[in-house]
Amino acid sequence: SVKIEEGQGDKGGHFVPDRIVLQGMVFYGYHGVFGSEKELGQRYEVDLELALDLSSTGRTDDLEYGINYVDLYQLVREIVEERSYNLMEGLAEAIASEVLSNYPMAEVTVAVRKPQPPAGGLMDFFGVKITRKK
């Protein structure tokens, strides 16, 4: 559990310049509109950016005042690998909702990419990027 000091969190709706970033997380999931996507599964890439005041964590240099990145990674992994959604929008929304519910922050940005999607041609990825606030 994270200790919250005065001023940490959403700062009363004010701009929070600090960020925690988890970039390029790779998971194997079973999401998609087509049956084959849900049966065979495929690789998904997820980026997460949390906006919160990190001054207490930096000042104390104590994880008790911060967010454990490994726990955050495991939460995202569980959502991507153990649940199934038709759309990347649904997957991104679930990640944002769970992260906002479990951690003290002003907002979260979630990007989900599906590399080499079934598009009938060559393409790097399909993707969505959403930002949600408390």
Protein language model annotation of sequence segments:
Residues 2-7, 11-134:
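N-terminal, polar/charged subdomain of small-to-medium soluble alpha/beta proteins
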